[in-house]
Regions:
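Short helix-capping/linker segments at secondary-structure and domain boundaries
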Residues: 30-40, 92-98, 136-139
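Catalytic DNA-binding helix-loop module of base-excision-repair DNA glycosylases/AP lyases
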Residues: 28, 107-144
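Intrinsically disordered, low-complexity, charged terminal extensions of DNA damage-control enzymes
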Residues: 1-9
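Short Gly/aromatic-enriched secondary-structure transition segments
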Residues: 41-45
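A generic alpha-helix surface/boundary motif
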Residues: 22, 39-40, 110
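Short, hydrophobic/amphipathic alpha-helical patches that form generic packing surfaces
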Residues: 22-31, 87
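Structural motif
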Residues: 10-21, 32-33, 75-80
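Alpha-helical ds-nucleic-acid-binding substructure associated with the helix-hairpin-helix region
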Residues: 48-120, 132
């Protein structure tokens, strides 16, 4: 199976918005669901519905997210995934800039990983997917 990259999804992890989009994609791909379903969910949420910022996603109703996730096959996971996506978007909106500043100042990849793991529904697999591309791009972004 082909590894999905940020580039495959049209994501440039060069700023906070790109970090959010890649985190969203990594979150979806980190679930026990086929990667094609996760990619389709990302495309519907971001490309079709324009939920491409933490604030836009946070302002989406739980029932709307359940419906959108259900369209692509998250039937077993739609309730919990929708709830966790709302939590993720709110926490990213509140904390991402500070986390990026801390990463830039201290080059603290482990601290950034711990922050990612603090999200409900984010486990080692999601962090692995995110860090595969996210860390390299972030360190280049911050000149380290």
């Amino acid at each position: 199976m082909k590894t999905i990259t940020a580039c495959d999804l049209g994501i440039e992890v060069t700023d906070a918005l790109g970090v959010f989009r890649w985190l969203l994609a990594s979150f979806l791909m980190g679930k026990r669901i086929r990667s094609a379903v996760a990619v389709e969910a990302y495309r519907i949420l971001v490309d079709q519905k324009g939920l491409d910022t933490p604030l836009k996603l946070a302002r989406t109703s739980h029932s709307t997210l359940i419906r959108l996730l259900g369209q692509v096959g998250y039937a077993r996971y739609d309730q919990s995934t929708a709830r966790r996506l709302l939590g993720l978007s709110k926490k990213v909106e509140a904390e991402l800039d500070a986390q990026l500043d801390a990463l830039r100042e201290a080059s603290n990849a482990e601290g950034f990983k711990r922050w990612l793991l603090s999200f409900e529904g984010v486990g080692p697999k999601t962090v692995e997917i995110f860090m595969r591309e996210g860390l390299g791009q972030l360190t280049m972004l911050h000149g380290h």
